[in-house]
């Protein structure tokens, strides 16, 4: 018996787009492309297109749906542009275009393009169909086509009228755009229906098809069950008791029952049924063929109007009999037996054919699983079966007594018949009417006879038997024996072993319902959301319908190893036969692989792989369809025969999935783990080479596809146009950003000037107002080149006095920013003491700047001069923290305005190397800065303490003043005061 889910079928919402396209397209060659990704990559191609183009499915995946990879030198450029425009505008169109197969053979194709929409009416896919029309086009003239002259003339004659092409596209001319959805099916030659949408939806049925599990059909089945029992009761009764249909009311009732059963036949032609795989079959053609092959003939024979035909045959006899008012009515008296035997003929034949109506019980048999779904109905049905058996036995028991009570030879009544004994017991003996009809009359009434017959059969079936009605003749005794045998069997089976029957017949069903109850309790206990709960329940029902509650692993464990391997090979035969990678595998290798395979059943919406999850299995799709989603876009649709996962045999590391793999329909996957596959490949070395060479993954989850969405491209284009149309941003001259960039530009110019000054060192001269370097005796001093930053803001001139070091007393230095302490005045004396932190910044700045200059080879040694004269007109910036010294002159202009006589002779051969600041100096500076920061922090803490004390004192004074003042004074104090008044108040306090 099947459980409720199996009877109902698999009715969860699923995306059957791929199955519908494949079913409707028949032998059409087509590909599906994603309409939301740039270049519209191919996400699915059927076997027909692969065979037509010569490419494997894995080779065309992710290539453009325009099939640009099949273009060649003879492909028309205008047609290529029209194809691209059709994709860009999401239009339906058809083209004749020349393309090239994988072996570069030119082929003429009739290409038809149609957009596929989802539930939001958004184009998500493109369906492109290809028809080979090379035979109807002029052969392509090249070196490989010599000798085709006759064929060329023939094809030119065929294509002159273009009649064949019109048959290929009866309603769509070349280049014609079709905008009406109703013509989509006609364009693509997929039938009269509109192309399905790419969305998840519940199984739909045509308007004239009835679901077998709907409320109406369930109610109708119960009505048919009741009428079937009505037929099973009345047909044997009417045949045994030879009841004529002289009662118009009963004739009308029987006719209505016949009409209802005829209507049931019509409904069966429009009622869905459950297929062998658990799917709901709603195709009208399949429904009709299935019913015609199974129960149609039996149902038709059981519905013929035998009562109506019999009534017309006996109309004269019934009228004559009803016209005699002295006769006993047939409702109360048994019809004369002799008269019934004398009037045999067509009427008796049709009366006997009423038994054919018992074939209606077949309806109960084939729909028994509908009724036993309810526990109380099972017990009622069993009791009804027992009572129906007793009723049939009672009718047969009366027929035996009616046949033996009259002796045909002597025209007398047999005294040993049970009917004669019953007539004598109840006081209604039989009497012979010699003066009238000359027939036997009287006897027990029909009701008494039926009740007595049923009483006898029930006592016999239950093995009770009181003996007040007992068989006397041989036939009666034989029948009594048969009744007792049947009764013992029925009694023991139905009543004695009801519990055993339920356990044996419904063990799987009980286990199924127990599992469902456990799952329901679990979902209710943990308050699982409704959507997820429905998915869980649907998955359990679908899995049970596929496995029928059989634990495959448990069964395989019972079998020995050799038998278990044979069973596994049989279970995975589809994978081994469909994929060429297993063709060269030996029997032992196949058996080893089959032992490692696992069968996985997936419900619609299940995620087989999540993005970022480890890919540790190789999956073969046996049935159903799946979609691969990367960045919320469908990048591939996988169907029967596809393989996805990772190339474990080529990669040493475990891969992470770059996309989600989600089931669109109910799917059956054959999965093998990574470690198990590698173990088999390591053992069977010869097979491993063939396997790695021939197995082509339809989609490799390790690789991430790089694409750009059309929506992103359009958005970027809109932003670019928006920026282009916007007015440029204008910053005022005194804007901080503009000043910052101006400072960077000036510093760059100063560095370039320093470099040029180093290169022109031989001609260097010092202009008026700059510091001069003199040459004294034989001692030479290194003069530092300064990088001077010039700002637009006016600077305060600061006089500078060159300080002589102990080592070089007669030399002056051109001071760099921050290199020396500058006094506020130009006179002699010591420089004011500067902060250690400023000196540390100056030292670091000098170290970095001088190193850069040294690396750029822009620092040149300056020769010694004989005299030191003049002063450098240096300026200090008005910045309070930078301390950068500025000059009105630039180093690249040094020496240009000086006269030759003012210049000192340059000793080119005397060079002084530059040495950066020693590390000990930096360390000392850092320690000094650290000590100074500690002192500053202590000073700040002391100031904060003083401020807190002052605030506390102020609060205390305010509190005391408030407590000592009147409300009027408080009101006056609360008024706003000027800053001067506030200072006066606080000062006074």
Swiss-Prot record:
Its main location: membrane. The keyword Cell division does not apply. The chain crosses the membrane at residues 221-241, 249-269, 291-309, 346-368, 378-399, 478-498. Channel activity is inhibited by interaction with Ca(2+)-bound calmodulin. Interaction of a single pore-forming alpha subunit with a calmodulin chain is sufficient to promote channel closure. Channel activity is not regulated by cyclic nucleotides. Channel activity is inhibited by binding intracellular phosphatidylinositol-3,5-bisphosphate and phosphatidylinositol-4,5-bisphosphate (PIP2), but is not inhibited by phosphatidylinositol 4-phosphate. Inhibited by the spider kappa-theraphotoxin-Aa1a and mu/kappa-theraphotoxin-Ap1a. InterPro entries: cNMP-bd_dom, cNMP-bd_dom_sf, Ion_trans_dom, K_chnl_volt-dep_EAG, K_chnl_volt-dep_EAG/ELK/ERG, KCNH_animal-type, PAC, PAS. Belongs to the potassium channel family. H (Eag) (TC 1.A.1.20) subfamily. Kv10.1/KCNH1 sub-subfamily. This is Voltage-gated delayed rectifier potassium channel KCNH1. It comes from Homo sapiens.
């Amino acid at each position: 018996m099947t459980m409720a889910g199996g009877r109902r079928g698999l009715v969860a919402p699923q995306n059957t787009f791929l199955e519908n396209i494949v079913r409707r397209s028949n032998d059409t060659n087509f590909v599906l492309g994603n309409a939301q990704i740039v270049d519209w990559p191919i996400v699915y191609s059927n076997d027909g297109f692969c065979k037509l183009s010569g490419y494997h499915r894995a080779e065309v995946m992710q290539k453009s749906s325009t099939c640009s990879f099949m273009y060649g030198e003879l492909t028309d450029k205008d047609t290529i542009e029209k194809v691209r425009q059709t994709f860009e505008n999401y239009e339906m169109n058809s083209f004749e275009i020349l393309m090239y197969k994988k072996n570069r053979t030119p082929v003429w194709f009739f290409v038809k393009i149609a957009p596929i929409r989802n539930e939001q009416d958004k184009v998500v896919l493109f369906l492109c169909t290809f028809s080979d029309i090379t035979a109807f086009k002029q052969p392509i003239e090249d070196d490989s086509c010599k000798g085709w002259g006759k064929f060329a003339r023939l094809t030119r004659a065929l294509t002159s009228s273009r009649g064949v092409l019109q048959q290929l596209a009866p309603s769509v001319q070349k280049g014609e755009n079709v905008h009406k959805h109703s013509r989509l099916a006609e364009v693509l030659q997929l039938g009269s229906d509109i192309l399905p949408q790419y969305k998840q939806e519940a199984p739909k049925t045509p308007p004239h098809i009835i679901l077998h599990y709907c409320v109406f059909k369930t109610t109708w089945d119960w009505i048919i069950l009741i009428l079937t029992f009505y037929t099973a009761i009345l047909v044997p009764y009417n045949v045994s008791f030879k009841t004529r249909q002289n009662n118009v009311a009963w004739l009308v009732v029987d006719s209505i029952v016949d009409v209802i059963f005829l209507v049931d036949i019509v409904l069966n032609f429009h009622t869905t049924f459950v297929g062998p795989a658990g799917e709901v079959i709603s195709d009208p053609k399949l429904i009709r063929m299935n019913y015609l092959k199974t129960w149609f003939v039996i149902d038709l024979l059981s519905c013929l109007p035998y009562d109506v035909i019999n009534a017309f045959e006996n109309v004269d006899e019934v009228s004559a009999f009803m016209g005699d008012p002295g006769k006993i009515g047939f409702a109360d008296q048994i019809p004369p037996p002799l008269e019934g035997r004398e009037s045999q003929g067509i009427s008796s034949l049709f009366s006997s054919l009423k038994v054919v109506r018992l074939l209606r019980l077949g309806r109960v048999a084939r729909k028994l699983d509908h009724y036993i779904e309810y526990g109380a109905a099972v017990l009622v049905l069993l009791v009804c079966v027992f009572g129906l058996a007793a009723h049939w036995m009672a009718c047969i028991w009366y027929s035996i007594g009616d046949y033996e009570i009259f002796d045909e030879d002597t025209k007398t009544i047999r005294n040993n018949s049970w009917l004669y004994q019953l007539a004598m017991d109840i006081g209604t003996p039989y009497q012979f009417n010699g003066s009238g009809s000359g027939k036997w009359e009287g006897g027990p009434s029909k009701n008494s006879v039926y009740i007595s017959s049923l009483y006898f059969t029930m006592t016999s079936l239950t093995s009770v038997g009181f003996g007040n009605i007992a068989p006397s003749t041989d036939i009666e005794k034989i029948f009594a024996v048969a009744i007792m045998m049947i009764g013992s069997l029925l009694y023991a089976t139905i009543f004695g072993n009801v519990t055993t029957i339920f356990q044996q017949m419904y063990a799987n069903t009980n286990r199924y319902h127990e599992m469902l109850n456990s799952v329901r309790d679990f979902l209710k206990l943990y308050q699982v959301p409704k959507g997820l709960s429905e998915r869980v329940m649907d998955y359990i029902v679908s899995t049970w319908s596929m496995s029928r509650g059989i634990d495959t692993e448990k069964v395989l464990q019972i079998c020995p190893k050799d038998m278990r391997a044979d069973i596994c090979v049989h279970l995975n035969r589809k994978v081994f036969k469909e994929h060429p990678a297993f063709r060269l595998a030996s029997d032992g290798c196949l058996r080893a692989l089959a032992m490692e395979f696992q069968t996985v059943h997936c419900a619609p919406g299940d995620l087989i792989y999540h993005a970022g999850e480890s890919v540790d299995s190789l999956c073969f799709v046996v049935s159903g369809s799946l979609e691969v989603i990367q960045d919320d876009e469908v990048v591939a649709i996988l169907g029967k025969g596809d393989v996805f996962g990772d190339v474990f045999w080529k990669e040493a590391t475990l891969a992470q999935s770059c996309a989600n793999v989600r089931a669109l329909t109910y799917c059956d996957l054959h999965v093998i783990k990574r470690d198990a596959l590698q173990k088999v490949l390591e053992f069977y070395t010869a097979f491993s080479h063939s396997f790695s060479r021939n197995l082509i993954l339809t989609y490799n989850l390790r690789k991430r596809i790089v694409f750009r969405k059309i929506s992103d491209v359009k958005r970027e284009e809109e932003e670019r146009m928006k920026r282009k149309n916007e007015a440029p941003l204008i910053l005022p001259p005194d804007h901080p950003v503009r000043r910052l960039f101006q400072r960077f530009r000036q510093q760059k110019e100063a560095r370039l000037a320093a470099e040029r000054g180093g290169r022109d060192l031989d001609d260097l001269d010092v202009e008026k107002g700059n510091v001069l370097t003199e040459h004294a005796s034989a001692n030479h001093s290194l003069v530092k080149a300064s990088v001077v930053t010039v700002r637009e803001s006016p600077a305060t001139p600061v006089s500078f006095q060159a300080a002589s070091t102990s080592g070089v007393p007669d030399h002056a230095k051109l001071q760099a920013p921050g290199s020396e302490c500058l006094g506020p005045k130009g006179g002699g004396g010591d420089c004011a003491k500067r902060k250690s932190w400023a000196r540390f910044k100056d030292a670091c700045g000098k170290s970095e700047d001088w190193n850069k200059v040294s690396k750029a080879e822009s620092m040149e040694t300056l020769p010694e001069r004989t005299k030191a004269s003049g002063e450098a007109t240096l300026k200090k910036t008005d910045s309070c923290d930078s301390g950068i010294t500025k000059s009105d002159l630039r180093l690249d202009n040094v020496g240009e305005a000086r006269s030759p006589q003012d210049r000192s002779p340059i000793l080119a051969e005397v060079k002084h190397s530059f040495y950066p600041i020693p590390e000990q100096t930096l360390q000392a500076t850092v320690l000094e800065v650290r000590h100074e920061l500690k002192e500053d922090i202590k000073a700040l803490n002391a100031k904060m303490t003083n401020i807190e004390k002052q605030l506390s004192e102020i609060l205390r004074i305010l509190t005391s003043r408030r407590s000592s003042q009147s409300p009027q004074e408080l009101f006056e104090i609360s008024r706003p005061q000027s800053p001067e008044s506030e200072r006066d108040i606080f000062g006074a306090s």
